[in-house]
Regions:
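N-terminal non-catalytic structural scaffold regions of very large proteins
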Residues: 1-169
Length: 169
């Protein structure tokens, strides 16, 4: 019960599922961020039948949450944010059936290359370079061990990666 309340109070307000369709293309996914790909059946509240949705989990949320003493009075117990989101994915899609899902994380090329001759303002160049690192070229894709071939192939295509860049963890 505590986990459900925590999800509804602290996590759910920050999650924005994006149903993919021509008007809503695959979103930008930051380097090494926690994300979920979800396969759905049925229509959403607007009558759309988008089969795939992406749920990006904000970095502002702690990855490990300590359960309060009233729930675990004798020892410190922690629950992972990813397991909380996994357990409540269906709450993000009312009236729809979640048929499969997978957690995923993309690693992006993060070299910072600055041309000393072209850089007039080092501070600005560094700021722009560091921002670009979050959304550089994808080089590796991690998915849950049980991720279906359909979902992993879909993600590989979105990130323009070969099969050799896929890691099941």
């Amino acid at each position: 019960r505590w986990v459900h309340d925590y999800f509804m109070r602290e996590v759910r307000p920050l999650l924005i599922p994006v149903g993919l369709d021509p008007a809503h293309p695959f979103p930008q996914v930051a380097n090494k961020s926690l994300n979920f790909i979800v396969r759905l059946k049925g229509r959403d509240a607007f009558g759309r039948e988008n089969e795939i949705a992406i749920v990006k989990v904000p970095r502002a949320l702690p990855r490990l949450i300590r359960m309060p003493p009233k729930v675990a009075p004798k020892e410190a117990l922690f629950v992972s944010l990813s397991s909380i989101v996994r357990a409540h994915l269906h709450d993000l899609f009312p009236g729809r059936e979640v048929t499969e899902f997978s957690q995923f994380r993309v690693t992006r090329h993060s070299d910072l290359a600055l041309d000393e001759e072209d850089v007039r303002n080092l501070r600005t160049a560094l700021r722009q370079g560091l921002q670009h690192r979050h959304y550089g070229q994808a080089v590796r894709l991690e998915v849950s061990a049980g991720c279906s071939v359909f979902l992993s192939d879909f993600l590989l295509e979105q990130f323009d990666l070969p099969g050799a860049a896929l890691y099941r963890v």
